[in-house]
Amino acid sequence: MVIVGAGFAGYNAARGLRKYAPDAEIVMINPTDYFLYLPLLPEVAAGLLEPRRISVSLPDRLRGVTLVLGTVTHIDLEDHKVEWLDPEGRPGGIEFDRLVLAAGSVNKLLPIPGVAEYAYGFRSIAEALFLRDHITRQLELAATTADRDERDARCTFVVVGAGYTGTEVAAQGQLFTERVARQLPALRNQPMRWLLADLADRLLPGLHPRMSATADRVLRRRGVEIRVGQSVQYAGVDSLRRTTGEEIATRSLIWCVGVRPDPLVEGLELPTDHGRLQVHETLVVRGRAHVFACGDCAAVPDVTRPGSITGMTAQHAQRQGRLVARNVAASLRGDDLEPYKHHDLGFLVDLGGWAAAANPLNVPMSGPAAKAVTRGYHLYSLPGNRTRTGLDWAVNAVLPPRAVQFGLVGRLNQATSPGTRFSS
């Protein structure tokens, strides 16, 4: 059995297959040797957690699963074969009896002039660390310039996309810049300007309005400028233009507009729904009894809302990964397959500091109580490093971390060449 991808869906599929098909040979193909717990990525960018805390070793946690480091380049569904390139560009291939597609998603990049060249993506450890270095550098450079306009521009940060990621990045980022500025006497009276923009009419448009209102209130109270119903029209190296026509001088455009299914899906030439593979309620790909799909790359029918598909969330991916393991094992035995059914446990948004918005089991919460629930859920959901993560949080509560650069940002911010700031 071959699993493509090691996100929430792929990781849980591999864990389940070890249990439900202990005698099967399980091969996982993934570009990295770790599972990334994406919900805590904003805390890495803000210097609150070390990258290792949310990077869980696959060889350590998935004993009995063969990990192949590589990026899948081609899947032959007729001959049951998967081909890949390893990190050094060497080709490889393997045949399969059952295939689980859990390739996940990548940054959604819109055709807006300058975004690919000058915006910063936020989907990987590398991007989070790069962004942290970039923000730290901007403030340190602002502290040494006598040019007021340049200082203001370097202390201005624009986040586009007010979903989960964008809202949390703006919340954590604003607190991070305030913390860094306190280390720099020259910035003691310098405002840290953060703007959060989205074409929707409110923050967190996919969540309950009460959670949106909580996030809006917390961020505005901290001075974050909320710009709903608008986005970016053009981005340059030191400024951007909003769709309202306003020009904003900034060196920091952070792109959190959303995600799209991994491009691997497009090359399969199978039926899709909004770019996601069409599957039955049992997670079997339509017309391919030996192929299963789950997570962000699969358009799984939502039985609680007939006619719609499940959202691209970690909660769904985790549950679908567990179900796909049971169904793959059942298909090998010739047993009936289970349909995907779910009951939402609620949603959580960490707003930094002691603030959060949550509705566990549809019970609305905010403030420290929501924060406790949010962190408790993350500790429960982390497949590893729970103790170290909890200790980091405890220490940071009394001893705030100091910000330093790690040298990831090259001269003129060109650590990556133009057009490659977005990693997949």
Q: What does each model-found stretch correspond to?
A:
Residues 9, 104-107, 170, 259-261, ...:
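Short glycine-rich anion-binding loops that position phosphate/pyrophosphate groups of nucleotides
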